[in-house]
UniProtKB/Swiss-Prot annotation:
Belongs to the cyclophilin-type PPIase family. PPIase D subfamily. One of its GO terms (cellular component) is intracellular membrane-bounded organelle. Pfam families: Pro_isomerase (PF00160). CDD domains: cyclophilin_ABH_like. GO terms for molecular function: cyclosporin A binding; peptidyl-prolyl cis-trans isomerase activity; ribosome binding; unfolded protein binding. It is found in: Cytoplasm. Keywords: Cytoplasm, Isomerase, Repeat, Rotamase, TPR repeat. TPR repeats lie at residues 218-251, 269-302, 307-340. It comes from Debaryomyces hansenii (strain ATCC 36239 / CBS 767 / BCRC 21394 / JCM 1990 / NBRC 0083 / IGC 2968). This is Peptidyl-prolyl cis-trans isomerase D. Residues 11-176 form the PPIase cyclophilin-type domain. It comes from the Eukaryota. Gene3D superfamilies: Cyclophilin-like, Tetratricopeptide repeat domain.
Length: 370
């Protein structure tokens, strides 16, 4: 029997949209489920060669994550079909459930996907939250020890039909690391000064019970976003403002002092408004509307900030081709700031667009009845 000190460590190098996203490292529980752990390890190295039955290489390299459900899990391992209907183990097409000693009690666990009892193949999933309803049904056999931020990015990617990512997230390379491999620190600077995980609760650098620790992290991300914006890196600026906003969305402190409550509200307003501004520059209506709506929900929002949020929300609706909602938001903004030239122009643009659309509809209808 193996022990914890000698647990195998394997890795996935993941890419999406033709760009590398980073490395995820797993520790496998071969001291508890040796057969299941060995299956995953060997599929990472590809050492078993081709399958005798299918002729496919028994290897995760080149396969995709085919099913992602936010606040649940990320599933992959179907290297034969890439859709969730295929894959096979190193022992044959399927093998039995080894045991259910380990439970799905935290995020970032590795567990076997299956089609019922004793149908384990090569498909696996990574939990992103505790999933106790899976206990006794799926075999837990490892955990993520490095690259949690990559898993969070994967979890939050755009999805299409059947929860499949719109862009393929590919295991571009995979293999085994030395058993004494030490995970690199989670606080790896991405080149912008951002040392934080994608989700605040995953980050050992942040004490969520200390408001100052949270505020420091959010302020750092916000400042990085501002620098990126000044440098002309608009997409990177949005990414940092949005990340800071995400930290605040996940922060539900109890018994904050009046001073800290004021700081929290000010940070929320600043991050949400900045995210809306940058999303507008990127001409992304949906993201603009979402960020501006978040700003409008902040308690004790002042009129100046409310005006900015309503204007940006209105312009977001215009980008999204919802002119009626755009007009409503901009008219509310104009009531707060009647002399604001940008709001007046925005309303003119909306009314012009509405008139052009209606004229086009009338013309089409007249042709229909002529």
């Amino acid at each position: 029997m193996s022990d914890k000190l000698n647990r195998p460590k394997v890795f996935f190098d993941i890419s999406a949209d033709g760009k590398p996203k980073g490395r995820v490292v797993f520790e496998l529980y071969n001291d508890v489920v040796p057969k299941t752990a060995e299956n995953f390890r060997a599929l990472c190295t590809g050492e078993k060669g081709a399958s005798e039955s299918s002729g496919k290489q028994l290897h995760y390299k080149g396969s995709i994550f085919h099913r992602i459900i936010k606040d649940f899990m990320c599933q992959g391992g179907d290297f034969t079909h890439g859709s969730g209907i295929g894959g096979e183990s190193i022992y044959g097409e399927k093998f039995e459930d080894e045991n259910f000693q380990l439970t799905h009690d935290k995020p970032f666990l590795l567990s076997m996907a299956n089609a019922g009892a004793n149908t384990n193949g090569s498909q696996f999933f990574i939990t992103t939250v505790p999933t106790p309803h899976l206990n006794g049904k799926h075999v837990v056999f490892g955990e993520v020890i490095q690259g949690k931020s990559i898993v969070r990015q994967l979890e939050r990617c755009d999805k299409g039909e059947n929860d499949k990512p719109v862009e393929d997230w590919i295991i571009s390379d995979c293999g085994e690391l030395p058993s004494d491999y030490v995970p690199v620190p989670t606080s790896v600077d991405d080149g912008t000064g951002d040392i934080y995980e994608e989700v605040m609760a995953d980050d050992d650098n942040i004490n969520v019970n200390d408001p100052e620790s949270v505020f420091k992290a959010v302020t750092t991300l916000k400042d990085i976003g501002t620098k990126q914006l000044k440098d002309g890196n608009v997409a990177a600026a949005y990414e940092k403002y949005n990340k800071a906003s995400g930290f605040l969305n996940d922060y539900f402190p109890e018994d904050l002092s009046e001073e800290n409550l004021s700081k929290l509200h000010a940070l929320k307003l600043s991050c949400y408004l900045n995210a809306a501004l940058v999303a507008l520059k990127l001409k992304d209506g949906k993201k603009t509307i979402n960020a501006a709506s978040n700003a409008l929900e902040v308690e004790a929002i002042d009129d100046k900030s409310k005006t900015k949020a309503l204007y940006r929300k209105g312009m977001g609706y215009l980008l999204a081709k919802d002119e009626e909602s755009a007009q409503k938001s901009l008219e509310e903004a104009l009531q707060l700031s009647p002399e604001d030239g940008a709001i007046i122009k925005g309303l003119q643009d909306v009314k012009t667009t509405i008139k052009a659309r209606r004229d086009k509809q009338k013309k089409a209808m007249s042709k229909f009845f002529s």
